[in-house]
């Protein structure tokens, strides 16, 4: 399963640990209004995964990264099952995607980061290859998965490239001396 665009990221086990770390490191460098984005920074380790809260929950969702580090008591299975139909009837794709594919709203760490980045776009989650900028030196792209491999190019590639040095301003041309008056 490919990454899809940032808004509709789904689990892709073909991403290796290094690729995941690159994405997270890039995310952690994002700044808001010139200040480090501490609010959304997360540790960059991936293994071992956090222990499941409930074994039943783990078997239900069938993937490895459904657990949030947040202890949200309102996000239990019962309340989520009640919310899910109403959410999807209203056709809120982010809500439905997170509840159906991430263990009842529990996004894995990478998905939560990419969803956050996607929120800085134009709000159209099915746009592809659209550049959008988070305040700071990095421009992120919504990219579509490669049609052959199904894997989306690393969205954080720009983060690995040092910011281009500012081009020095061209010196103003020397004023031509005025011709002597006749």
From Swiss-Prot:
It is found in: Spore coat; Cytoplasm. Residues 68-79 have a biased composition (Acidic residues). Palmitoylated by the erf2-erf4 complex. Its main location: other. Residues 33-103, 163-182 are annotated as: Disordered. It comes from the Eukaryota. Residues 52-63 have a biased composition (Basic residues). Disulfide bonds: none annotated. Keywords: Cytoplasm, Sporulation. GO terms for molecular function: structural constituent of ascospore wall. GO terms for cellular component: cytoplasm; Isp3 layer of spore wall. Disruption phenotype: Fibrillar structures absent from spore coat. Increased rate of spore wall collapse during germination. Spores sensitive to thermal stress, ethanol, and cell wall degrading enzymes. Normal rate of spore formation resulting in spores of a normal size. Residues 80-97 have a biased composition (Basic and acidic residues). GO terms for biological process: ascospore wall assembly. The keyword Amino-acid biosynthesis does not apply. Forms fibrillar structures on the spore surface that contribute to spore wall integrity. This is Spore wall structural constituent isp3. The gene is isp3.
